[in-house]
Curated annotation (Swiss-Prot):
Belongs to the ClpX chaperone family. NCBIfam families: clpX, PRK05342.1. InterPro entries: AAA+_ATPase, ATP-dep_Clp_protease_ClpX, ATPase_AAA_core, Clp_ATPase_C, Clp_protease_ATP-bd_su_ClpX, ClpX_bact, P-loop_NTPase, Znf_CppX_C4. Component of the ClpX-ClpP complex. Forms a hexameric ring that, in the presence of ATP, binds to fourteen ClpP subunits assembled into a disk-like structure with a central cavity, resembling the structure of eukaryotic proteasomes. One of its GO terms (cellular component) is HslUV protease complex. GO terms for biological process: cell division; proteolysis involved in protein catabolic process. Gene3D superfamilies: 1.10.8.60, ClpX chaperone, C4-type zinc finger domain, P-loop containing nucleotide triphosphate hydrolases. ATP binds at residues 118-125. Pfam families: AAA_2, ClpB_D2-small, zf-C4_ClpX. This is ATP-dependent Clp protease ATP-binding subunit ClpX. PROSITE patterns: CLPX_ZB (PS51902).
Length: 421
């Protein structure tokens, strides 16, 4: 903890948050007031959000694809092709709703979306960000927990109940919401051959999701159906809901060599070297018949006409994810250290080492937090009991070999931290 001198008559305070000059990095003076760097950052965030809201509400409430993609860029690093496909699909979906409100002889069909990409590539974050910038209700479901109605597990109608709860039981808002179903590859048909055993968590779930995705009036029990059988049901129309499904389709990796050989027989290296570049190129070329071979039924594939592929995140993208987005992990931990009056600094080679560890673990962006937690655990344990520390520096040796970080004290003295017992 930094050594703070006692309050005196000369101590200055922020006029907005009340923090003293010793608790913040900078205190900017005005004619009769002071403002700290934290309040300045908060004001900038408010201005940015208002600017984004203004963009989203242009053109009668339907943002253009470029506007949607621009906002996604602030939260999601890379994945340009997927963001472009999503932006166009979402723009067309909500333009379709505005079109449906007018009298017309032409009825535009709904285009639900399938996101294909490895773990930690940003599928869930993209769906969450879309719902946030469009200001529509959002819910997320795990396909592995779903079963047909009447069997142990979660009924598909519970997805609509969660969306309704997200909309504070406003049925009209819920009917324009976004539903994200994760792990959709886990409900593939177990076998091509008929079986006397009913597939209640595979093909059965696909069949149950069909009507919801194409549009039906679902009877939703507001308190859950199994524990309160006597309650009144709410009628929710799913016709205007946008369904986004995501899956890693990990078992495809073994068959990608055969797919690559069929589609690029002249390139032997493509069949042999399963690099992230090759994998991404194959994912970009996935066709509905590939999904059929994987185990999704034709009717289900037909409800997902828009297919967007996400690539594996490389080292450069992971470094940007660590430091660039608004809620970047480095910024989050930096704020925790600021609460102790200490500045947290990561060197460039430390960020590169963290990104390499995430790639080796094959966890993508999802694994970055656990890596940072293991690196900073000892420091966060010791720091509250230390005096005079102004800065903690994490270098490559700390990130790779779990060495002790460098502590910078008030008079410019730097030394490695002592190993805690």
């Amino acid at each position: 903890m930094s050594n703070k001198s006692g309050d005196s008559k000369n101590t200055l305070y922020c006029s907005f948050c009340g923090k003293s000059q010793h608790e913040v990095r900078k205190l900017i003076a005005g004619p009769t007031v002071f403002i700290c760097d934290e309040c300045v950052e908060l004001c900038m965030d408010i201005i940015r959000e208002e600017h984004k809201t203004h963009l989203v509400k242009s053109r009668d409430g339907v943002p253009t694809p470029k506007e949607i993609c621009k906002v996604l860029d602030d939260y999601v690093i890379g994945q340009f092709e997927a963001k472009r496909a999503l932006s166009v699909a979402v723009h067309n979906h909500y333009k379709r709703l505005a079109h449906a409100a007018k009298s017309s002889d032409i009825e535009i069909a709904k285009s639900n979306i399938l996101l294909i990409g490895p773990t930690g590539s940003g599928k869930t974050l993209l769906a969450q960000t879309l719902a946030r910038i469009l200001d529509v209700p959002f819910t997320m479901a795990d396909a592995t927990t779903l079963t047909e109605a009447g069997y142990v597990g979660e009924d598909v109608e519970n997805i609509i109940l969660k969306l309704l709860q997200s909309a504070d039981y406003n049925v009209d808002r819920a009917q324009r919401g976004i539903v994200y179903i994760d792990e959709i590859d886990k409900i593939s048909r177990k076998s091509d051959n008929p079986s006397i055993t009913r597939d209640v968590s595979g093909e059965g779930v696909q069949q149950a999701l069909l009507k919801l995705m194409e549009g039906t009036v679902a009877s939703v029990p507001p308190q859950g159906g199994r524990k309160h059988p006597q309650q009144e049901f709410l009628q929710v129309d799913t016709t205007n809901m946008l369904f986004i499904c995501g899956g890693a389709f990990a078992v495809w990796t073994r068959s990608f060599r055969r797919v690559a050989r069929d589609r690029a027989s002249a390139s032997v290296q493509m069949c042999v070297l399963m690099t992230s570049v090759v994998l991404g190129a194959i994912l970009q070329s996935v066709e509905p018949e590939d999904l059929l071979k994987f185990g999704l039924i034709p009717e289900f594939i037909g409800r997902l006409p828009v297919i967007a592929a996400l690539n594996d995140l490389d080292e450069s993208a992971l470094i940007q994810i660590l430091s660039k987005p608004k809620n970047a992990l480095i910024k989050q931990y930096g704020r925790l250290f600021e609460m102790e009056g200490v500045k947290l600094t990561f060197t460039e080679d430390a960020l590169a080492a963290i990104a390499k560890r995430a790639i080796e673990r094959k966890t993508g962006a999802r694994g970055l937090r656990s890596i940072l937690e293991s690196i900073l655990l000892g420091t966060m344990f010791d720091l509250p009991g230390l005096e005079g520390v102004e800065e903690v520096v994490i270098n490559r040796d700390v990130a790779e070999n779990k060495a002790q970080p460098v502590y910078v004290y008030g008079k410019g003295k730097s030394e490695p931290a002592e190993q805690s017992a």
